[in-house]
Curated annotation (Swiss-Prot):
Protein's name according to its UniProt entry: Ferredoxin
UniProt cross-references to InterPro entries, sorted A to Z: 4Fe4S_Fe-S-bd, 4Fe4S_Fe_S_CS, Fe-S_Ferredoxin
Cofactor: [4Fe-4S] cluster; [3Fe-4S] cluster
Keyword Cytoplasm: no
PANTHER family, sorted: ADENYLYLSULFATE REDUCTASE, BETA SUBUNIT, L-ASPARTATE SEMIALDEHYDE SULFURTRANSFERASE IRON-SULFUR SUBUNIT
Annotated organism of origin: Pyrobaculum islandicum (strain DSM 4184 / JCM 9189 / GEO3)
SUPFAM superfamilies, A to Z: 4Fe-4S ferredoxins
Lineage: superkingdom: Archaea
Binding annotation for [4Fe-4S] cluster: C17, C20, C23, C57
Subunit-structure text: Monomer.
Short name of one Pfam family: Fer4_10
PTM remark: The N-terminus is blocked.
Signal peptide: none
């Protein structure tokens, strides 16, 4: 699973998300889901950097990690995962956070 570090992933701004589900419907890998509050959440191991979710979000709540503003990256809860990560996935995730300058802890 360490190969996950090669993927860029997306930033999901929970403050902007309107719970429309367009991102969930657009993702060919089923890498997004709506959480218990109706907000978009990334399923890390399914994401393959297709970025369909970025293109269809009507309020621009989703962006590529490399293009997200520092303010968006610093918000608590901007990246959300559907399940706990394995130790290998956690290591890959930490490498990804370092690569893209991520500072906020997960919720």
């Amino acid at each position: 699973m360490a190969e996950l570090a090669k993927y860029e992933r997306v930033v999901i701004d929970q403050d902007i998300c309107i719970s429309c589900g367009a991102c969930v419907a657009a993702c060919p890998y089923q890498a997004l889901e709506l959480d218990e509050n109706g907000k978009s959440r990334l399923i890390w191991e399914k994401c393959k950097d297709d970025f369909s979710c970025v293109a269809v979000c009507p309020v621009k709540a989703i962006s590529k990690a490399s293009e997200a503003t520092p303010e968006a990256k610093a918000k608590k809860g901007w990246y959300r995962f559907g399940k706990s990560l394995t130790p290998e996935e956690q290591k890959a995730f930490e490498e990804w956070k370092t690569k893209y300058g991520i500072t906020a802890p997960p919720v």
